Structure formats: structure tokens, C-alpha cells
Amino acid sequence: VDQEEKDNEQYQRKLFRDYVLRKNDHLEIRRELKRRFDAGAELTGPKGLRKQLAAFDLGYFGRAYLKHYFVRPSPSFHEELDEIWTKGVLKGRNPAMDAKKISRLDGSKNVVAAPRGHAKSTNFTFKDSLHAALYLYKHYIIILSDSSDQAEGFLSDIKTEMEDNQEIRLDFGNQQGKVWK
């Protein structure tokens, strides 16, 4: 095991400890995940604790799987964006257990306005679309942007993460798609 892998494992363990009990939503599940973590349960892999916590904690999902995008401390505004997705799309449900139910729920209509550079697209278009695809609660994700080039860029970034991101591959398996458009 090289130093980079050791550093990543240390990062992932600290991140899990920092996030598992940080909020009160899904509190029973959070407590059980913490108990299992303390007992030495596997953090990674298809049944790992990371995948289970990231199912309903979008802030954790971004930092655990997309740490190269979420490098600085997030402003509270990003928590508000996550809350919009959690309430509007997930309806407070846990996609690890309720993906099929979530996929059949009515959608939501929300408008978010913020200045350029506030990571609205990074959160909604990129992170949350990737989350929906990996946890299988949205089957047809539409990406709208100022231009087709910008939308294609987001799709390309999502494709790259699904196919090449080692953390995603470790927990979700091979996500290589046949057609991307």
C-alpha cells in the first residue's frame, strides 16, 4: 500500500467520523452506522458504510466521492442546496432503501438564484445528478445549461466520474455506459 492510498484511507475515515452524526435526519440510521464503524465494519465496498451514509447525506457524498471538486470548506449556502434536493427530489427518503419509491414520486419545481461562481451547477447538475444515477432513483436525467457545449461538458464530467473514479468503482462497481448523449 503506497502513501497516497494510506492518506486517502485516513481522509475517508476522518470524513466519516466528522459526518456520520453531524445532522439529525435519519438519526437512527446514522447512529447504527456510527456503531458499526466503531465496531470495525468495512468503510468501503458495495455494502460499505461510506455508500450507506452517502445515500442520504449529500454533503458527505460530495466530499467522499468527489473530493477533487469539493476541496474547500463549503458555505452554508451549499447545505441549503442539498436540503432543496433532499426535500424536493428525495422527499426525505433514503435512496439506499427506497430508490424505487423515490423514482415514482412526483417531481419538484424549485428555482435557485445565486451569483456566478457559487457552485449551483457543481452541486445540482453534477453532484446530485451523479448521486441520482448511482443510487438508481432517477432513470432519465436531463441536463439543461446555457449552451449545449456546457451541458455536454457536465455529461462528460459525470461520465468520467462514473467510469474512472476509483472510490465510485469500489463502492458501486463498474459503471461504464454504452451510450452517452
Please name every model-derived segment.
Residues 131-140, 163:
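Post-Walker A helix-loop "phosphate-sensing" segment adjacent to the P-loop in P-loop NTPases
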Residues 144-181:
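Conserved nucleotide-state-sensing and coupling region of NTP-binding domains
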Residues 79-86, 122-134:
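Contiguous, well-ordered alpha-helical segments that form the cores/surfaces of helical PPI scaffolds
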Residues 111, 142-145:
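A structural signal for short, well-ordered beta-strand segments and their strand-loop junctions
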Residues 115, 130-132, 175-181:
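Catalytic micro-motifs at enzyme active sites that drive phosphoryl/nucleotidyl and oxygen chemistry
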Residues 1-108:
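N-terminal accessory segments
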Residues 104-129:
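Walker A/P-loop
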